[in-house]
């Protein structure tokens, strides 16, 4: 029998240590807001219902969450009175009678579905309450997990821990799972008899233990539950995410020559057999097919790179770029909102924007599509087996037919029929011996000007 599950994401914290007007959970790792990383893993853990508790920046957080997850419930914690109080802000959702309750924090972007599945498995096995825990050589600052006979009996915050308890290296990971039938009753028994006068979610451990409930701990890797409180921790978490992504790609058959220098986005898709050189950036929406080579210092976003294509070095692919099989885009080229056909080449110093290029076409060095008049964008269409010479300006809207040649240095403003040759430049004029006369004239002029100054 499939167990129903309500996941509650706590994201009401003010995040003052981020020192940013942006709500903490909307800061990004790999191009995706922190809270969306959490929501993604919750979905993979087969949550049937999702609730998000918002506070500071609630409207912004709500907008992002609702655009990322369908049918999400939003609740506001109007007063910051602790984590248990935050969960009770979602009382309406807690009353729906689900089998499992998962409670996670919106600033833990490295959480993994496997950990959530493990905690739910403990509930299915008979546990009433399950906390996530982790071992660390330096437990300073973390709540300690106190166990007895294999059961969790309490979570003691460091400021309240005895010297003996401070030696415990098993710490609270911040994720909580409960049977739905116990959730409200336990939460309502949490009091605020502490220095901060707040209602702590961790008190549920001792409350449940005293009631004779089955309280367990699932050990998870520390990196899976890392929380974000400032921009330094954000950077460290991003680095952990990047290492994880690079490892997964290399194990799948992708060659990364210097993985620590490559930056991936959360939705980057790279097929086996791809080779990626150092210092490459993958923005949102990039797909790279097998056999492609992405050379050093290239920047890709919103682009599809076809099989056996070669990109870079120093190439930029912008959103809307679609490169077919064996396309070459070389150094200092920028391609935007353009489709490039099989085996076509854009090898040097070119800008191709709002264009469609056929197969087996060569775009010479310094070619520019002039696609913008200050108000509107216009399209350039170049057929199959065409040749565009170096230092050419293509003023769109423009169609260049199959098999046509464009002479180097041309400014092309009119359509070119197929198998034609177009020249769009002034004829070269040679005046033999004129350079000597020209230099003499310039020298005479300079001497005259110098005399006038004196």
Curated annotation (Swiss-Prot):
Gene Ontology annotations for the cellular component aspect, listed alphabetically: cytoplasm; membrane
A UniProt-annotated Pfam family: NTP_transf_3
Subcellular location(s) per record: Cytoplasm
Single annotated GO MF: UDP-N-acetylglucosamine diphosphorylase activity
Residues that hold UDP-N-acetyl-alpha-D-glucosamine according to the record: 24, 77, 82-83, 143, 157, 172, 229, 318, 336, 351, 362
Positions of the catalytic residues: 348
Cofactor note: Binds 1 Mg(2+) ion per subunit.
Assembly behavior: Homotrimer.
Family annotation (PANTHER family): BIFUNCTIONAL PROTEIN GLMU (PTHR43584:SF3), NUCLEOTIDYL TRANSFERASE (PTHR43584)
Similarity remark: In the N-terminal section; belongs to the N-acetylglucosamine-1-phosphate uridyltransferase family.
NCBIfam families noted in UniProt: glmU, PRK14353.1
Designated name of the protein: Bifunctional protein GlmU
Gene name per UniProt: glmU
